[in-house]
């Protein structure tokens, strides 16, 4: 971690973190907000493929959630990345992506990282493009879910970013 991150700690989420993750996602005003229940389940069932960053008091101020795809055990899909507004600009999102990719590669042998990003989310586009560059990995993009498949009203398409093969962190 950098000097700007020195007072922070990254570890696996716990069920007790679910409400804070839900609030951080809600306050991001960019992410699709899932139910509070889903964040609680995520912290219980997918803690091994997710991470939380805590302030000096142990309070979550950022998170990354992901899972290993059941039909592609070499692939980590990153579901959401968010950092509390007061902690943005410190490189925490990149630290979370790098740290999670390294941990899951070490523990589960993943070589590919995937995520989906809507066309208007330029911050996430930059985050994952720079991740691919740091890893010297190929980045492929294709529309995974077009607007027409979303049943709940207008939704931008979700573009799949597929990054790999991954090399060790930089």
From Swiss-Prot:
The pathway it acts in is: Amine and polyamine biosynthesis; ectoine biosynthesis; L-ectoine from L-aspartate 4-semialdehyde: step 2/3
Q: Which InterPro entries match?
A: Acyl_CoA_acyltransferase, Ectoine_EctA, GNAT_dom
Q: Which GO terms describe its biological process?
A: ectoine biosynthetic process
Using the UniProt record, name the top-level EC class of this enzyme in a single word. transferase
Q: Which residues form the N-acetyltransferase domain?
A: 8-166
Q: Does the keyword Acyltransferase apply?
A: yes
The alphabetical list of record keywords is:
Acyltransferase, Transferase
Query: What SUPFAM superfamilies does this protein's entry cite?
Result: Acyl-CoA N-acyltransferases (Nat)
Family named by the database record: Belongs to the acetyltransferase family. EctA subfamily.
Q: What is this protein called?
A: L-2,4-diaminobutyric acid acetyltransferase
